[in-house]
Amino acid sequence: ILILVGVIAWLLLRPQEQPAGLTRAADAQLGQLEGKTEEQIVEELNRIVEEGMFNISINTQPEFPDGSSPGNLCIENSPANHYLMVVEITLNDTGEKVYTSGALEPNYHIQEAKLDRALAKGTYPATATFYAYTADTQELVGTAGAEMQLIIQN
């Protein structure tokens, strides 16, 4: 868990590209302010991690009666998330995108949906990629993925 917290903190706190025209403060020092207790530092890191994290939820074995009918994707943007979510499903063997959702606000879900492309009967290993965007600026803030199998029955 400490490694995960460290990786997340590094991703959130790493130096970003500077916008044109800004210069870094020459007298700035790396790290937390001197005199902070360990408890205060951990509390701040936990707050940053909570703000930057998001939950993903999707049926990892959705079934479709046939290649052009809706299937039970069960995509959910948890009420605890702070971000808009867009979900893309791609086939692992070809990299072909077979589904893209619209933006889901927190506490919204998609119970069933058709794939963007009809697939023949069979089981298809795929990956669902969740893209998290800020609601106000629609800036991409992160991605997460889930392995899945699309099951086309007929």
Explain the meaning of each model-derived region.
Residues P70-S78:
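Short edge beta-strand/loop segments characteristic of extracellular beta-sandwich folds
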Residues T94-S101:
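Surface-exposed loop/edge segments in extracytoplasmic proteins
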Residues R24-D66:
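Transition segment at domain starts
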Residues F64, N77-Y83:
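A short beta-turn/strand-edge loop motif at beta-sheet boundaries
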Residues N72, Y108-R117:
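Exposed aromatic-hydrophobic patches
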Residues A120-Y124:
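A glycine-anchored, Pro-Gly-centered beta-turn/N-cap motif
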Residues I1-W10:
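Hydrophobic membrane-insertion alpha-helices, especially the h-region
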Residues A135-A144:
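Beta-sandwich strand segments
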